[in-house]
A protein has these predicted regions:
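Non-catalytic terminal accessory segments
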Residues: 2-63
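Extended recognition/assembly regions associated with phosphoester-bond processing machinery
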Residues: 15, 19-22, 56-58, 70-73, ...
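Soluble catalytic domains of enzymes that build or remodel membrane lipids, polysaccharides, and related
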Residues: 73-219
Length: 219
């Protein structure tokens, strides 16, 4: 409902701007001015049906996740490794809508790819941590299978509400938190995880690169 209210408010704002422009410099066609009440009613239902359709589509998309394959060729050699399969998931927004069942579906999809490594790229939680805590969703994320590990970086939602509780909960998921830090999942490449831009004092990429062997692939 929060998202729907935003779209409805924006639509009404646009309509109000159109109405004001008509008062400044009339440009509505005669048929519209002659049937203004019917026009307003039509526009109202268009907004309601449009936002409803958009929300239904968004809900269907969230409830039926798909895997998108992206192939990237790196110019640097990674030892004897000729390929690396990474599952990247972002914006899970675990909360009132995204709960245990859907997270289990995400985990199953990830494991079906047989990845070498999994990266959770921010906004793991929507707002408060209590929904994930009460449902023990950390136990589901522990089921992510990847021989090189599971890595987690912050998004802006990790800084909302009870950020310390979120930090403690993320540590229970079995993943490695990368907050302005660098790791080597194995000896052939580096993985750099930056803090979210909302943290104004986050380290620069240049400082994180200090001590990194630039002859190896860096992700």
């Amino acid at each position: 409902w929060y998202i729907a209210s935003i779209y409805i408010t924006l639509s009404l704002l646009v309509l109000e701007l159109i109405r004001l422009s008509q008062r400044i410099k009339p440009w509505f066609p005669k048929w519209m001015k002659g049937h203004w009440q019917q026009t307003k009613l039509t526009l109202f239902f268009l907004i309601v049906f449009g936002v409803t359709g958009l929300m239904i589509h968004a809900y269907h998309t969230v409830m039926n996740p798909i895997v998108k394959n992206v192939y990237i060729t790196l110019p640097k050699a990674a030892g004897d490794r000729d390929s690396l399969t990474i599952v990247m998931m972002s914006d899970l927004h675990i909360g009132e809508v995204i709960g245990k069942d859907l997270v289990q579906k995400y985990v199953a999809l990830s494991n079906a790819q047989h990845p070498d490594m999994v990266v959770l790229a921010g906004d793991i939680m929507d707002y408060e941590s209590r929904f994930a805590e009460n449902a023990h969703i950390e136990d589901d994320l522990k089921q992510l299978k990847a021989p090189l590990g599971v890595y987690i970086v912050y998004g802006n939602h990790e800084y909302r509400a009870n950020r310390n509780a979120k930090y403690r909960w993320l540590q229970k998921t079995g993943g490695t938190l990368l907050i302005d830090s660098v790791v080597q999942p194995d000896s052939t490449f580096y993985l750099i995880g930056r803090d979210d831009f909302i943290h104004k004092k986050r380290k620069s990429l240049h400082s994180l690169m200090e001590g990194v062997d630039t002859g190896k692939p860096i992700i």
